């Protein structure tokens, strides 16, 4: 599995301008030079996670690389990252009520033609809108309460036939390597695109049988390379047990259908993941289809579309998809406000679903003929005109006192409760946090999973969330408390002396022998 190396102790911050991407064209966007590109329009690439393009992507520096982020005021971003329970609860209750109402109507009208539109609505809410619930709760940003996110995520995972642990790690990889061939497991339309495959996806007739096959295979303990590449070894057993639970539930529904001599049970559980998938694909095809592969700029590989309020409810604002990929720590209900903050740095959004579909299908037709064809680039500010680390807070620069291993940080009133600040001690990156009870905590400044700068993250009392993959740490102990973060942060004791904050940094002597790693910007 292509995991980040172990990161312990302080991480060396670059002193120069933000690192440039591996290869930069005239707009400042990194692109991989496609080998063997000739005048021939047919160049078939390997989208496998263990194929030749995977090796090329890693060698080119695309794995967990630096992505462009639009400038935004850090205080405003902090407000936008705040999660609530009320709004997502209302949305969840309304969705479940509509689902239950459609299901009840479908049951009561069995044997009449009225049952057809009732099941159509039920399926769309189950196999279509359920995808948005799976996605938002999978990020852990919908609800403030972790248990609510996890409960909704697991329910929606079953509805979508997606094994929870496998798909959580798959989506983490998608955010790390969006549309990077050989690294992104969720490239829905591969080049050259098959228009027949696209059509069949509207009924889940391509991915659906594959997912059912994986559930059966995993339930019997057979784990293929795809799963082993994505999921850490210590989580593979969980994949097996989740598959067994899913298989047991599906077999139970199938047995009920056989016993009753009717397909009705399957129309309520199992088949909605197929006949309702048209709504999933109706929205999802607008996210990335036809856009550029192998670019480290979401503005080139992701699409934002303006849609009506009903669609935004069904889709949970994922039409603001560029914004979501740049700032995945922002909950879905704050994405419209985030869009207003950064839209000057983004390409013009598609004005409607029709506008988006015209672009998507024109691109698919052209790329079917010539895989190298690209959508003419919309205007975006060149990278050179926007400072790539403009969302980063200004670091407090301090040094350890000779012989003491201690560093003075500043007055005890340096931060208000709930605030955090980046600190650079002897050139290494750390983060100072103040919990709601007024206590200070001092930890490494770079995530142990995705090498993201934690000072760009979200502090909720004593829990610090990484801005890149939503992994979380308890700043009091350094413990990783939410995946994908697994390795703890190093922590350092902070004391108050004569109204001044002092941190003891003796552990830094051990850090000095460890490899230095540049703190990556996130996107």
Positions of PLM-derived features:
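Histidine-centered catalytic micro-motifs
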Residues: 130-140, 167-179, 283-290, 314-330, ...
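Transmembrane alpha-helical segments that form the membrane-embedded catalytic/substrate-channel core
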Residues: 124-134, 163, 167, 211-214, ...
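Post-HEXXH active-site segment of zinc metalloproteases
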Residues: 143-157, 336-341
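N-terminal pre-ligand scaffold of iron-sulfur
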Residues: 391-461, 475, 488-523
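Membrane-embedded alpha-helical segments that form the functional core of polytopic membrane enzymes
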Residues: 109-132, 151, 155-165, 273-277, ...
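Non-catalytic, topology-defining segments of multipass membrane proteins
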Residues: 2, 8-12, 20-124, 133, ...
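Short cysteine/histidine-rich metal-coordination sites, predominantly Zn2+-binding motifs
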Residues: 461-467, 480-489
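Active-site-proximal inter-transmembrane loops
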Residues: 227-234, 298-320
């Amino acid at each position: 599995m292509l995991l980040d190396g172990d990161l312990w102790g302080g991480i060396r911050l670059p002193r120069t301008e933000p690192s440039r991407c591996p290869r930069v064209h005239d707009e400042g966007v990194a692109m991989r030079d496609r080998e063997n590109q000739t005048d021939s329009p047919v160049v078939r690439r390997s989208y496998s996670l263990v194929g030749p393009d995977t090796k090329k992507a890693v060698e080119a520096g695309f794995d967990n690389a630096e992505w462009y982020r639009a400038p935004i005021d850090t205080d405003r971003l902090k407000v936008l990252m705040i999660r609530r329970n009320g709004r997502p609860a209302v949305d969840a209750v309304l969705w479940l009520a509509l689902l239950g109402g459609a299901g009840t109507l479908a049951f009561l009208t069995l044997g009449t033609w009225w049952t057809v539109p009732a099941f159509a609505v039920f399926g769309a809410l189950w196999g279509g809108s359920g995808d948005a619930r799976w996605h938002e709760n999978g990020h852990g940003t919908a609800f403030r309460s972790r248990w609510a996110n996890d409960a909704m995520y697991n329910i929606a995972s079953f509805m979508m036939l997606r094994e929870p642990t496998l798909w959580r790690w798959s989506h983490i990889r998608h955010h790390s390597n969006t549309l990077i061939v050989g690294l992104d497991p969720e490239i829905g339309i591969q080049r050259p695109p098959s228009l027949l495959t696209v059509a069949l996806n509207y009924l889940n007739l391509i991915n659906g049988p594959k997912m059912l096959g994986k559930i059966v295979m995993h339930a019997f303990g057979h784990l293929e390379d795809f799963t082993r590449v994505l999921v850490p070894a210590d989580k593979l057993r969980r994949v097996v047990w989740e598959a067994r639970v899913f298989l047991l539930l599906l077999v139970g529904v199938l047995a009920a259908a056989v016993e009753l001599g009717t397909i009705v049970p399957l129309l309520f559980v199992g088949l909605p993941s197929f006949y309702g998938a048209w709504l999933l694909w109706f929205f999802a095809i607008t996210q990335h289809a036809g856009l550029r592969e192998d670019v480290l700029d979401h503005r080139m590989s992701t699409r934002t579309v303006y849609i009506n309020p009903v669609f935004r409810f069904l889709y949970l604002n994922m039409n603001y998809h560029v914004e979501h990929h740049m700032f995945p720590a922002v909950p879905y209900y704050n994405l419209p406000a985030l869009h207003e903050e950064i839209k000057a740095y983004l390409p013009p959004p598609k004005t409607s679903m029709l506008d988006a579909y015209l672009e998507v299908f024109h691109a698919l037709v052209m790329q079917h003929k010539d895989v190298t064809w690209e959508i003419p680039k919309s205007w975006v500010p060149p990278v050179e005109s926007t400072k790539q680390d403009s969302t980063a807070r200004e670091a407090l620069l301090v040094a350890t006192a000779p012989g003491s291993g201690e560093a003075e940080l500043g007055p005890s009133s340096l931060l208000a409760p709930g605030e955090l600040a980046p600190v650079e001690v002897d050139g290494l990156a750390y983060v100072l946090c103040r919990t709601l009870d007024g206590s200070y905590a001092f930890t490494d400044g770079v995530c142990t999973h995705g090498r993201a700068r934690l000072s760009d993250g979200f502090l909720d009392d004593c829990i610090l969330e990484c801005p890149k993959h939503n992994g979380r740490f308890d700043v009091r102990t350094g413990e990783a408390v939410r995946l994908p973060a697994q390795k703890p942060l190093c922590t350092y004791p902070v004391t108050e002396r004569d109204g001044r904050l002092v941190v003891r940094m003796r552990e830094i002597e051990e850090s000095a022998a460890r490899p230095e790693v540049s703190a990556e910007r996130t996107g």
